[in-house]
């Protein structure tokens, strides 16, 4: 079985919340795709409940696209500690951290239920499992800790 980078990362050494570049892949035609680890809570210490994480996922899908060019996808980790962000092109971890911070600030302070996309049975495969309250509370908690653009030492942006 192929080795997966995420499973070789020493999760006891990282200091969340942070943004980490996992890899940049160059395709046959020269296109670059980047994969980032958006770690919101400390691994093996905490995990965001599914309803809040699900709502954060739906909101980041739009909010990150508003703040960062080339967003392909933002998907939650199964461990519920953060997200993979996949983009076209190269972005510094500082750029991504600023986009993430702005998105979480919007969730914490501005977003209302009517702003959350994909919350009915036609547009979401588990539409009953959402919590804007939880998304807002977790966003506030993450922001209170500061988002670092480095995974192993705190360099809060």
From Swiss-Prot:
One GO molecular function term of this record is:
iron ion binding
Q: Where does Fe cation bind?
A: 54, 58, 124
Q: What cofactors are annotated for this protein?
A: Fe cation
A GO BP term, please?
Answer: quorum sensing
Cofactor detail note: Binds 1 Fe cation per subunit.
What InterPro entries does this protein map onto?
LuxS_sf, Metalloenz_LuxS/M16, S-ribosylhomocysteinase
Catalytic activity, reaction form: S-(5-deoxy-D-ribos-5-yl)-L-homocysteine = (S)-4,5-dihydroxypentane-2,3-dione + L-homocysteine
Quote the EC number. 4.4.1.21
- Keywords of the record: Autoinducer synthesis, Iron, Lyase, Metal-binding, Quorum sensing
Q: Tell me the subunit arrangement.
A: Homodimer.
Family stated for the protein in its record:
Belongs to the LuxS family.
Q: What does this protein do?
A: Involved in the synthesis of autoinducer 2 (AI-2) which is secreted by bacteria and is used to communicate both the cell density and the metabolic potential of the environment. The regulation of gene expression in response to changes in cell density is called quorum sensing. Catalyzes the transformation of S-ribosylhomocysteine (RHC) to homocysteine (HC) and 4,5-dihydroxy-2,3-pentadione (DPD).
Do you know which PANTHER family this protein is assigned to? Answer: S-RIBOSYLHOMOCYSTEINE LYASE
Q: What is this protein called?
A: S-ribosylhomocysteine lyase
Q: Read off the lineage from the record.
A: Bacteria, Bacillati, Bacillota, Bacilli, Lactobacillales
